[in-house]
């Protein structure tokens, strides 16, 4: 990382913390996924932690995963995201996922794993080295309090930045349902590349398949993100200025 990128990273973190403070949000980072599950069980009773971050299926005692939650002024959890490290040095992400895509299913859906499939795109075929997988991204916004605030963008990019501080990965990747991707979430939160049609999940009950894209970033993309302006509404700008 160049000195200029370090300075930009510091500015991004400072501006992010001001934005969080302007919305009376406190971020908490943790490594215990039993604790994460307990937090989400209370905050989102209908949500089941996904298999990639399930404490019953994974051992993260080596520091290969962390989670982030945001807590509002009333003590409510209003955001979550989680990241874990995968090392595919000497191979490619495409090869890894060809063998292990069933480790990344959508939660709470009974799947026909015989029919479900992974299709390697050109991005995954080129990607090798240390990978950070990004998942569990959620923001509670039932009353529209955070709409137009830029929070989803900043929270996601803050997770990317934290991954670089923990592991300095060569790439970061995520899977996103088509209906979410088509609403512009990938572009809005900072993902610069996508492989379409990556995963096809077939429910056992005969419903149509769920199709996902694979969004990803190269290491240099993550360094570039702090240079990209974030659009926020006027109220948020005023709040952030007062929090400075």
Predicted regions and their residues:
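Anionic, Ser/Thr-rich low-complexity intrinsically disordered regions
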Residues: 5-26, 79
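Residue-identity detector for threonine
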Residues: 2, 26, 64, 89-92, ...
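Intrinsically disordered, low-structural-confidence terminal and linker regions
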Residues: 1-2, 244
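A conserved beta-strand-loop-helix scaffold within acyl/acetyltransferase catalytic domains
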Residues: 21-131, 135-137
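Serine/threonine-rich low-complexity intrinsically disordered regions
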Residues: 5-9, 13, 44, 89, ...
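Acyl-donor binding region in acyl/amide transferases
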Residues: 97-196, 200, 204-208
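Charge-rich, low-complexity intrinsically disordered segments
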Residues: 179-244
